[in-house]
């Protein structure tokens, strides 16, 4: 039991630091002036003061503290739900690494460093690698939970 918990913690930390590091490296390149333009996607620098689609931007500086509370609350929840943590350590590592990276941006740059602008056929919100990793992590977690439960139900039947 302890061995699987240690392994899960290592997997979590590996995912956390990988996503955090890659995201911060990309943001560094953007902050140093990297730009790209095409018919579909542009790489531009935007400081997002809100969350997705600039929601909650009216909270200004308080948003980063709200996000810290959310991250800490989720982490405390996971400590108490150790089986959930062990089952989805990589997904939680991705989500936490990306979330902490975005919160760090708020403290260092005054807003999240966003840069991917999709505009082919319609304008989409500008986002970053961390945003994608949060979506992927949550998506994989939900898919695994759904299919795992389906598999468990078939075994019981």
Curated annotation (Swiss-Prot):
Signal peptide start-end: none
Catalytic activity annotation: Release of signal peptides from bacterial membrane prolipoproteins. Hydrolyzes -Xaa-Yaa-Zaa-|-(S,diacylglyceryl)Cys-, in which Xaa is hydrophobic (preferably Leu), and Yaa (Ala or Ser) and Zaa (Gly or Ala) have small, neutral side chains
Membrane found in the keyword field: yes
Keyword Transmembrane helix: yes
One cellular-component annotation, GO: plasma membrane
Annotated compartments: Cell inner membrane
InterPro entries: Peptidase_A8
Molecular functions per Gene Ontology: aspartic-type endopeptidase activity
Active site (catalytic residues): 114, 131
Main localization (coarse): membrane
Pathway involvement of the protein, from the record: Protein modification; lipoprotein biosynthesis (signal peptide cleavage)
UniProt keywords, alphabetically: Aspartyl protease, Cell inner membrane, Cell membrane, Hydrolase, Membrane, Protease, Transmembrane, Transmembrane helix
Transmembrane region(s): 10-30, 38-58, 59-79, 84-104, 122-142
GO terms under biological process: proteolysis
Pfam families, sorted: Peptidase_A8
NCBIfam families associated with the record: lspA (TIGR00077)
Family: Belongs to the peptidase A8 family.
Function: This protein specifically catalyzes the removal of signal peptides from prolipoproteins.
Protein name as catalogued: Lipoprotein signal peptidase
Species assigned in the record: Helicobacter pylori (strain HPAG1)
Species lineage: Bacteria, Pseudomonadati, Campylobacterota, Epsilonproteobacteria, Campylobacterales
């Amino acid at each position: 039991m302890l061995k699987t918990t240690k392994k899960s913690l290592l997997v979590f930390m590996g995912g956390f630091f990988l996503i955090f590091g890659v995201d911060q490296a990309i943001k560094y390149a953007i902050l140093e002036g990297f730009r790209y333009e095409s018919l579909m996607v542009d790489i531009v620098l935007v400081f997002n003061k809100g969350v997705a689609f600039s929601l909650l931007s009216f909270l200004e500086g308080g948003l980063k503290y709200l996000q810290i509370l959310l991250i800490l609350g989720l982490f405390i929840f996971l400590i108490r739900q150790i089986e959930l943590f062990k089952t989805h350590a990589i997904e939680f590592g991705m989500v936490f690494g990306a979330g902490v990276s975005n919160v760090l941006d708020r403290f260092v740059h005054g807003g999240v460093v966003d840069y991917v602008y999709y505009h082919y056929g319609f304008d989409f919100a500008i986002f970053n690698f961390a945003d994608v990793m949060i979506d992927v992590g949550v998506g994989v977690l939900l898919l695994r939970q759904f299919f795992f439960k389906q598999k468990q139900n078939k075994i019981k039947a």
